[in-house]
Every structure is written in structure tokens, then in C-alpha cells.
């Protein structure tokens, strides 16, 4: 049966992961949350009190503590660093506020992109991140770039944080998301931008089910060719 690669990119809290998980489940594809991989690398760096000047040490840690994924009994994606479950710690504010500088380190990106491409080569996949369509899967059959207003994305992050028991201030989140947008789109390595052949979709005010339906319709057209 024909299988394709689906790349979903976009800024923080644009709905990438939520949508990608549903689509992967519906199609029976592998789902890969690349953002969680960079968060895991950031968690490692912070645990060892490393900075952007400690590139070699960060790479050494990634060699020593592999980043892997699992599933809970309820179907929730679990993230491990070595054999430690870091699913919740990597969503804490300190990781969120530091992931931009870690993910901007060329050697970190090179290492994780290689792993992402290796996983993608094994069959149908839905992968979300910030450079999937431009760098990780440049030949993906379907590339989607999700956007949404800063206000809406801050509201989404605010609700997510409260559900996870993480303290949150809506106005602070708006500033943090705007700052993250700037850093992600202006970094020298793999800046956040839509691929030339991607489809941009504004999710502001659009339900998750409608976004999923839009993308799955595009995927079906490709699969039916």
C-alpha cells in the first residue's frame, strides 16, 4: 500500500503536534514529535548547567543519553532521556524558555536531524517541527505550514500549562511566544520558514477537527494518484 511522508511545520503552539498525532493515528503512520527531541536535549543541557558555549559537552550528553519515545497504557506519547521519563519535565517553563538556543546549535541539529531522517525512512510518517519541510524531509509528498495569531497561541499554551499543573501568566506567555517566533525565524541554522512547496494554513479560530480534515483531504488526493 502506498505510504507518504507528511511534514507539518509552524511556530510555537500553532497546533502542529495535536494535529500531527491525530493524522498519524488515522492513517496508521508513525508520528514523530521533533520538538520533544530538542526539548529533551535542552533538559539535558540545563540539568548539567551547560550554556551555548558548551557545545561539545551537550553533544557528548546526547551520545551518552539517547532520546527515545514510548507509549503509556492510555496511548500518551512518553519521552525518555536514557531510561528516565522526561515527558512532563521537558514541558516546564525553564525548558521552553531555553530550547531556542539549544536547537540553534548546528551540531545538535545535525545529530537530531540525522536521527529523524533515519526514523522517517522506515515507512509512512507524520513529522512536526520547524524545519521538517525545508531540511529534515525536503522530499515529503505533503508539506503543511500552520500559523495562528500570537494571542490564540498564548491562550492554547496557557490552557496546556494549567492542565499539566505548570504555573502560567497569559501576558508573559504572549511575550515569550513572540520572542520565540523572532528567535526561531532569525537563527542562522534552519530558520523557521515555510518550504516553497508547502501549503500555509491559518488555524486562528479553526477547530482541531477542521485542521485535521483539511490536511487529510490533501493527503488522500496524493494517495489516490
Curated annotation (Swiss-Prot):
InterPro entries: Cytidylate_kin, Cytidylate_kinase_dom, P-loop_NTPase
Chief place where the protein resides: cytoplasm
Catalytic activity: CMP + ATP = CDP + ADP; dCMP + ATP = dCDP + ADP
EC code: 2.7.4.25
Superkingdom as given in the UniProt entry: Bacteria
Enzyme class: transferase
CC per GO annotation: cytosol
The keyword Cytoplasm belongs to this UniProt entry's keyword annotation: yes
A GO biological-process term: pyrimidine nucleotide metabolic process
SUPFAM superfamilies: P-loop containing nucleoside triphosphate hydrolases (SSF52540)
GO MF annotations in UniProt: ATP binding; CMP kinase activity; dCMP kinase activity
Family named by the database record: Belongs to the cytidylate kinase family. Type 1 subfamily.
Protein name: Cytidylate kinase
Amino acid at each position: 500500500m502506498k505510504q507518504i511522508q507528511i511534514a507539518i511545520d509552524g511556530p510555537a503552539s500553532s497546533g502542529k503536534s495535536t494535529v500531527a498525532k491525530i493524522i498519524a493515528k488515522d492513517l496508521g503512520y508513525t508520528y514523530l514529535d521533533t520538538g520533544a527531541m530538542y526539548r529533551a536535549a535542552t533538559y539535558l543541557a540545563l540539568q548539567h548547567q551547560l550554556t551555548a558555549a558548551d557545545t561539545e559537552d551537550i553533544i557528548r550528553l546526547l551520545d551518552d543519553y539517547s532520546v527515545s519515545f514510548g507509549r503509556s497504557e492510555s496511548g500518551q506519547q512518553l519521552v525518555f532521556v536514557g531510561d528516565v521519563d522526561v515527558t512532563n519535565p521537558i514541558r516546564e517553563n525553564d525548558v521552553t524558555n531555553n530550547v531556542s538556543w539549544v536547537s540553534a546549535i548546528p551540531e545538535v541539529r545535525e545529530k537530531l536531524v540525522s536521527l529523524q531522517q533515519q526514523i522517517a525512512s522506515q515507512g509512512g510518517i507524520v513529522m512536526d517541527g520547524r524545519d521538517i519541510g525545508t531540511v529534515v524531509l525536503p522530499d515529503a509528498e505533503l508539506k503543511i505550514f500552520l500559523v495562528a495569531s500570537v494571542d490564540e497561541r498564548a491562550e492554547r499554551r496557557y490552557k496546556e500549562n494549567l492542565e499539566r499543573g505548570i504555573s502560567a501568566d497569559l501576558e508573559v506567555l504572549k511575550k515569550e511566544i513572540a520572542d520565540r517566533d523572532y528567535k526561531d525565524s532569525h537563527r542562522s541554522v534552519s530558520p523557521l520558514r515555510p518550504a516553497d512547496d508547502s501549503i500555509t494554513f491559518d488555524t486562528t479560530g479553526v477547530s482541531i477537527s477542521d485542521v485535521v480534515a483539511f490536511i487529510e483531504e490533501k493527503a488522500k488526493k496524493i494517495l489516490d494518484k
